[in-house]
Design a protein with these regions (language model features):
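Bacterial N-terminal signal peptides
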Residues: 2-14
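Extended repeat-based scaffolds of very large eukaryotic assembly and lipid-transport proteins
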Residues: 17-318
Length: 318
């Protein structure tokens, strides 16, 4: 009987402790949100950017909320509906100012904790709507949809590793999340993400051609170079072939069917060839670039010639 009583007391105490921790976290979140409402300041660089949410003193409310970590997300989500004003202002050197709302800081906290970008619904003027302005369909239409997105993401990912989440982000609808994933997998030399990056390049090589897709495949190639597996060389060559072809389309003589003069991004071209070089094929990469120089240099405008020459000179030191 004494043992049973002690057991019940222990279980009751543990339940109280767990419940108390949950209540304490929710209360702490509310306290820091109250502090956000008192935040002041102006855009530091005059581009209309959000006034510094992470000052050197990490006792600031945004920094404190980030420290609370992933378990805080369900308590933060309701505050996305808080559109009350802080005392901080976005300022642009062109003259306009805009007072910052509480939920603009809340979304920053959520993005920093999750290492994944969510976005507040885009605000459109009546004139923009009437003119048929296009809004990215991947963005939420309203706060409720945003809250659902974040809650769904949290339930799926709260216990997963950053590696697993970044591998998922390679196929995310938001291109900022895809680029962030490419960069992270390369920077951490994540061999587990290699095949995912290679498959992503295969997808990008299909269908319509645009500069976003070309920048993505170059970013994937760059990360594969950092991961360093020679098995990636074949897919990287495909990226080099694709970018080389479209450079030719941009700079070949008009009578040969030039299209989109100047649309080719030289930085992506050299980025992909640099990846081929670091995988052990430097001579091949340089040879490819020198062929391009001999064929199209004379068709480039002066600034493009200078950019190409500068990049080719650097390439010889890869």
């Amino acid at each position: 009987m004494i043992y049973l009583t002690l057991l019940l007391v222990t279980v009751f105490s543990a339940t109280q402790t767990t419940f108390g921790t949950q209540v304490d976290l929710k209360t702490k979140v509310a306290q820091q949100v109250d502090r956000i409402k008192l935040m002041s300041g102006n855009s530091q660089f005059g581009y209309g950017e959000l006034p510094e949410p992470f000052p050197p003193d990490d006792s600031a409310p945004v920094s404190q909320l980030v420290k609370y970590g992933m378990d805080t997300i369900p308590d933060l989500v309701p505050y996305l509906a808080d559109q009350s004003f802080t005392n901080a202002y976005r300022r642009h050197s062109g003259g306009w100012t805009q007072r910052v709302r509480v939920n603009e800081y809340i979304i920053v906290v959520i993005n920093r904790i999750t290492e994944h970008n969510f976005y507040l619904p885009p605000e459109q003027s009546d004139a923009a709507r009437n003119a048929g302005a296009v809004v990215d369909p991947a963005l939420p239409k309203d706060i409720e949809e945003l809250q659902d997105q974040i809650n769904t993401w949290w339930r799926k990912n709260r216990t997963r590793t950053v590696l697993d989440r970044k591998i998922d982000d390679v196929g995310d609808p938001i291109h900022e999340n895809r680029f962030s994933a490419y960069e992270w997998l390369g920077r951490t030399k994540a061999e587990a993400g290699r095949l995912t990056l290679e498959r992503r390049i295969d997808v990008l090589l299909r269908g319509e051609v645009n500069t976003l897709k070309q920048s993505e495949m170059a970013a994937c190639a760059e990360s594969l170079g950092k991961i360093g597996s020679v098995q990636s060389a074949d897919i990287v060559r495909k990226v080099c072939d694709h970018l080389t072809y479209w450079m030719g389309m941009s700079f070949r003589p008009v009578e040969e069917g030039r299209t989109g003069l100047g649309s080719m991004q030289l930085s992506d071209l050299f980025k992909a060839h640099h990846c081929l070089a670091v995988l052990g094929f430097k001579d091949e990469a340089l040879s490819r670039l020198q062929v391009l120089e001999s064929k199209y240099y004379g068709q480039m405008d002066q600034s493009t010639q200078q950019e190409f020459s500068r990049n080719l000179k650097n390439a010889r030191n890869w």
